[in-house]
Each structure stands twice: as structure tokens, then as C-alpha cells.
Amino acid sequence: MFTNYEKRLVETNGVHIACRIGGKRPALLLLHGHPQTHVIWHRVADTLAEHFTVVAADLRGYGDSDKPDAQQLTYSKREMASDQVGLMRKLGFDRFVVMAHDRGARVAHRMAADHADAILRMALLDIAPTLAMYEQTDETFARAYWHWFFLIRPAPLPETLIHADPVGYLRSVMGTRHAGMAAFTDEAFAEYLRCLRLPGTATGICEDYRASAGIDLVHDREDRSLGKRLPMPLKIFWGEHGVVGRCFDPLAEWRRVADHVSGGALSCGHYIAEEAPQALLAATLDFLQGNNGDVGSSLS
């Protein structure tokens, strides 16, 4: 996995963010979701590195990134977005392109709202805006995304149950989607399991979700009350066999908060980069390349 990529641990915003870096062209930041790490991109990373300097990062609380103690704002998407902008600046990229999945796409949404000048364009995978998803939650969504409501329970109950059976937790979250466990290589699954077992990961995951059900909604409602919109081009893709497209209208919801939105469904489930890597590359590569003259290209 990740041929010719370099591993780095970069200090920024008071934490260390783990990442892999590969390629020698304009900058592309890749962000993963729950309960995974940057390894979700392993099927597309080498191709992307032919066109970009790819930075595949672990979010705070996940993978080999720091997992700070939970406080009110520690795992807000505002803080997590600042981590990633700081990472890119430390690497020499003031402006860059983003592709992000699941929780990483929620971080990318906040990044685009708070640091619009840094983001040239974004591809977001299998989410609708967090506020829309909470406000439109119904029985179908709650049953399918049970973990949203399990992980926000007060500590230490969810953390204790995850630690008691991390393999079972991963299989219950990842293996019950459209493609089952067949979407994940043994090597990738072993890496997800290793990282879930690290001290602080279960807490980081839970605090990520607790923030989304709390302070992140406050920030999103503030943006809505101010009429704040995302100005950069967005490509929105979701799994044809997943929950997001069944329970929400992704393009309509993103058009409520952003000015330039296009995209559609791909023939897969939730874990797009692992289930349908070639379809993802075909759908996103031209968009991600865009006007490459605007993208920084230095690496320190």
C-alpha cells in the first residue's frame, strides 16, 4: 500500500497529525472517516500521486494522530479543520484541493467554511451536511446509522464496549453495509484494528461524534443565521446502495450551503474508495485537477 509514500508526524495546532505524503505535483489533501484511518485511500493513492502531491492524513483522535483529552471544543470540527489546514501549511501548501469521506468530509465542510481562501475545490463522499442530517433524522436513518446515537452516549459506556470487543465493533459498523467485509483487504482491516486498539482512539471517536451532536451544530446554525455559504466548487458523490442517498437529497442539501455543487451516485455502498476505486477516480480526477495553476506545489 502507498508505494513511494513517506510517513510523517507533523506538529500543528497543539497536536501531532500523522500522514503519508507522495507525489510531486499540486497539493491534494485526503481525509478519512470512521472507524478508519488514511488507509481507506490505499486503492487510489498511487494513481492520485501521479497527478498530485497527495497528503493522506489521520484526523485527530484517529489512526496515529494525537488523541488529546476531551474538553468542550477539543473535537469540534473547527479544531479538527484547523489541524488539517495547519498541517498543509507546515508542508508548504497555502492552497490545496480536498477529497474527504464520512467524518473527514465533515471536517472538510468546516474547513471550507472557516478557511475558504485555502480550499480550491472539494470532493465530498457519502455525506449530507451534519445539520441537515440531524434535523431530518427519521426511523430509517436512525436504524441504519445506529452508531451516531450510540457513540454520543456519555463516557465511558461506548468507550468501554468498544474496548471490550474491537474486532466485533469494526465488523458491526463496516461489515453490515452493502459490500460487507469483502470491501476491505486483510492488510487494511488489520491497520484499522491496530489503530482502534491504541490508547485514546475509542475516546477520540466518541468525542468526534459528541461534538457533531453538540458544538458543531452550534457552529453550523451560526453559519446558517449569517447566510454563510461555501464559495468553492464542490463535487458530491454518494453510494447508490448506501443510506445517504436513500434518506436525504445530497445535492439539494449541499446547494443550501454552497454555491457551486454537482455530483451524483456511484454504484457502491458507503465505503466508496475501497468498494469502487476505479469509479471514484473516473468521477473525480478531472475535477480535482481543475485549474492546477492555483494550487501550491512546495513541500518542506
PLM feature spans:
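Conserved strand-to-helix beginnings and helix N-cap segments that scaffold or border functional pockets
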Residues: W41-H42, C247-F248, P277-Q278
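Proline-centered flexible-loop/turn and helix-kink motifs
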Residues: P35, E50, A116-D117, D259, ...
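Short, well-ordered alpha-helices that flank and scaffold nucleotide-derived cofactor binding pockets
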Residues: R43-D46, E50, A113-D117, A282, ...
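Conserved HGGG/HGGXW glycine-rich cap/lid loop of the alpha/beta-hydrolase fold
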Residues: V15, R20-K67
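Generic C-terminal helix-cap and adjacent flexible tail
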Residues: D286-S300
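Catalytic histidine-centered segment of alpha/beta-hydrolase-like enzymes
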Residues: G269-L281
